[in-house]
């Protein structure tokens, strides 16, 4: 993946386009300055995009992978499943598990725990038969 050459001119055009697209994201101000109870750290999306643009101009990226990885990192920091970018180098590779996970409280009062769906289903069936 790191052997794919990087084209700075194309990257700059993409950033300009994506900047325009992200202007429609309604949570930018919230992400930049979230309330105290928000569980994720703040991220200034537009500033990070400008930083990536500066990296392109400064010649920081030596391959397409490192550029796309920075874009994807920005998007993941937004913690929004509605923000998805299918990019060229990273798109063919996905890492997934055939096992589903779920977060649930065992009694509705305790803090949620992470379970494999199959194990939780077995636990629920066993509990309901008791």
Model-derived segments and spans:
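Terminal targeting/pro-maturation regions of precursor/exported proteins
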Residues: 1-130
């Amino acid at each position: 993946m790191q052997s794919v050459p990087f084209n700075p001119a194309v990257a700059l055009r993409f950033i300009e386009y994506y900047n325009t697209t992200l202007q429609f994201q309604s949570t930018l101000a919230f992400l930049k300055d979230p309330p105290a109870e928000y569980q994720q750290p703040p991220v200034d999306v537009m500033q990070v995009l400008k930083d990536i643009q500066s990296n392109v101009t400064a010649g920081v990226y030596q391959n397409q992978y490192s550029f796309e990885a920075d874009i994807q990192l920005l998007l993941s920091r937004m913690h929004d499943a509605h923000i998805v970018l299918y990019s060229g180098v990273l798109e063919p590779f996905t890492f997934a598990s055939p096992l589903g996970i779920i977060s649930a409280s065992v009694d509705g009062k305790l803090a949620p725990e992470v379970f494999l769906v199959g194990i939780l289903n077995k636990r629920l069936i066993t509990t309901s038969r008791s």
